[in-house]
UniProtKB/Swiss-Prot annotation:
Its main location: cytoplasm. It is found in: Cytoplasm. It comes from Yersinia pseudotuberculosis serotype I (strain IP32953). One of its GO terms (cellular component) is cytoplasm. This is Arginine--tRNA ligase. It catalyses: tRNA(Arg) + L-arginine + ATP = L-arginyl-tRNA(Arg) + AMP + diphosphate. Monomer. Its EC number is 6.1.1.19. Keywords: Aminoacyl-tRNA synthetase, ATP-binding, Cytoplasm, Ligase, Nucleotide-binding, Protein biosynthesis. Belongs to the class-I aminoacyl-tRNA synthetase family. The gene is argS.
Length: 576
């Protein structure tokens, strides 16, 4: 049930009937304060200006023509021409009843699209570090949201699995006579990487062999391909451990590494030349873009093939977009990559559009994000200034949550305690990130993220346990709530209306890729439930009808909190 969309449609119809153009915008928003109703239509002023009318006069005409029979109990005009809409409590009660029993909390089915989401993208032969966290969890929240709405979502893990470093690694493994790479863990592999690099820099003969292996690997040499495959498999097996711990939906089947596009690269370069988009310049192949200027004010040259015949990230990204449209059949393509890559992506996509590889009707969206910073406002590092490994961060989160939870639950069975600690620790790290606008940098702070009050995962998880505890105490389930829902108190109405706004919120998150909007909504919802719980007797209500009505509101609150947190990839627990 998307109330905002319903009211926008009704107000637009009234505006058009009052003489507004067909493309007018009703600008219906959720009201910031209860005195302004539940929703406010702000579009009258802009339309009145176009029509040369007094806004108040147009607002009066719109209200006369606005048919909200059975939906609104009152419509008021405020200020110069704001239209305040107060929802009818009986109508709200009926919609809550529907949401309780309908699939997906009453969220309307969408016209399904095929949406490719590019996220996580770790490198082979490297352990995941905190720099991979934002892309991984924000991208996964987007994936979960789109899938919940009914879209066909293709997860694309654009793994860094190609490049000159593989010749070096293969040569070093051979040198150490350790071809049985499957026995290695990723930590061994990372040490190998460092030792291989040192040997490469110091031993010219080794460096020559490494370079020869790069050529062999690129030419499809069976031995080199086998060794490369082992390196990729070891890395992805270890990364899967991190994904599982993070409750992220990526699997090995979602890996679409850089190597996937290798065969396309010569064709892309040849095609861009044939279309007159790419030209030779000092031995390299370059696309000059009028949209981007260099420091001399001339069109910027984007290299797609080096003088030595090698390809660049831009070439791969062009092939990647083409593949996602032509082979995967994407209707929309989202990239969760940090903001520093923005110009690079925009240049690649400009070439993609000019070449006609992806039509304008298919959006290419860079959902960029800022950095995770330490308390000093600098990029988050270890005390010694090194990169923080993701596994170490998650270990510390679980350890800190363990102290918090074990202290409060000395009698909880060990298995349940372990599950709760894990859900709270991992949830705290994820929620601290997801609750911030993705476009900004944010400060990583253990104390804030594990706090049991404020907009944190522990608070949200506790809010959920508080709601479900009502049903444990009442000894009832959904099937025993047979009386119709009635709303008599303001706090009931506020909670019920906010519950019905779930579809508006999840639609916004799906459109804009902004999980912090869901976090804010759930936090607000938890606060409204807390106020309702404190001021409205549930189990000892004055009548059975009111008791069941309030239990229904509590039940929809529990379902909405659980579903909302699930779209963020945050686990709920039954008690804390």
């Amino acid at each position: 049930m998307n109330i905002q969309a319903l009211l926008s449609d009704k107000v637009s119809q009234a505006l058009i009937a009052a003489g507004a153009p067909a493309d007018c915008e009703a600008q219906v928003r959720q009201s910031a304060k209860a005195q302004f109703g539940d929703y406010q239509a702000n579009g009258v002023m802009a339309v009145a200006k176009k029509l040369g009318m007094q806004p108040r006069q147009l607002a009066e005409r719109v209200v006369e023509l606005l048919d909200l029979t059975g939906i609104a109990s009152k419509i008021e005009i405020a200020g110069p021409g704001f239209i305040n809409i107060f929802l009818d409590r009986q109508w709200v009660a009926e919609k809550v009843e529907y949401a309780l029993t309908a699939p997906k909390l009453g969220v309307a089915p969408v016209e399904p699209q095929t949406i490719v989401v590019d996220y996580s993208a770790p490198n082979v032969a490297k352990q995941m570090h905190v720099g991979h966290l934002r892309s991984t969890i924000i991208g996964d929240a987007a994936v979960r949201t789109l899938a919940f709405l009914g879209h066909n979502v293709i997860r694309a893990n654009h793994v860094g699995d190609w490049g000159t470093q593989f010749g070096m690694l293969i040569a070093y493994l051979e040198k150490m006579q350790n071809e049985n790479a499957s026995d290695m863990g990723l930590s061994d592999l990372e040490l190998f990487y460092q030792q291989a690099k040192k040997t490469y820099d110091e031993d010219e003969e080794f460096a020559l062999r490494a370079r020869a292996y790069v050529v062999k690997l690129q030419s499809g040499d069976e031995y080199c391909r086998q060794m490369w495959r082992k390196l990729v498999d070891i890395t992805m097996a270890q990364n899967q451990v991190a994904y599982d711990r993070l409750n992220v939906t990526l699997t090995k089947d979602d890996v679409m590494g850089e190597s996937l596009y290798n065969a396309m690269l010569p064709e892309i370069v040849a095609d861009l030349k044939a279309k007159g988009l790419a030209v030779e310049s000092e031995g390299a192949t370059v696309v000059y873009l009028d949209e981007y200027k260099n420091k001399d004010g001339e069109p910027m040259g984007v290299i797609i093939q080096k003088k030595d015949g090698g390809y660049l990230y831009t070439t791969t990204d062009i092939a990647c977009a083409k593949y996602r449209y032509e082979t995967l059949g994407a209707d929309r393509i989202l990239y969760y990559i940090d903001s520093r890559q923005h110009q690079h992506l925009m240049q690649a996509w400009t070439i993609v559009r000019k070449a006609g590889y992806v039509p304008e009707s298919v959006p290419l969206e860079h959902h960029m994000f800022g950095m995770m910073l330490g308390k000093d406002g600098k990029p988050f590092k270890t005390r010694s200034g090194g990169t923080v490994k993701l596994s170490d961060l998650l270990d510390e989160a679980v350890e800190r949550a363990g102290k918090l939870i074990a202290e409060k639950n000395p009698d909880m069975p060990a298995d349940e305690l372990k599950q709760v600690i894990n859900a709270v620790g991992i949830g705290a790290v994820k929620y601290a990130d997801l609750s911030k606008s993705r476009t900004t940098d944010y400060i990583f702070d253990w104390d804030n993220m594990l706090a049991l009050d404020g907009n944190t995962a522990p608070y949200m998880q506790y809010a959920y346990t508080r709601v479900v505890s009502v049903f444990r105490r009442a000894g009832v389930d959904e099937t025993s709530l047979t009386l119709p829902l009635v709303i008599t108190e303001d706090r009931e109405a506020a909670l019920a209306t906010r519950l019905l706004q779930f579809e508006e919120i999840i639609t916004t998150v799906a459109r804009e890729g902004t999980p912090h909007v869901m976090c804010s909504y759930l936090y607000d919802l938890a606060g409204l439930f807390s106020s309702f719980y404190e001021h409205c007797q549930i189990l000892n209500a004055e009548s059975e009808e009111i008791r069941q009505s309030r239990l229904k509101l509590a039940m929809l609150t529990a379902k909405t909190l659980k579903q909302g947190l699930d779209t963020l990839g945050i686990q709920t627990v039954e008690r804390m």
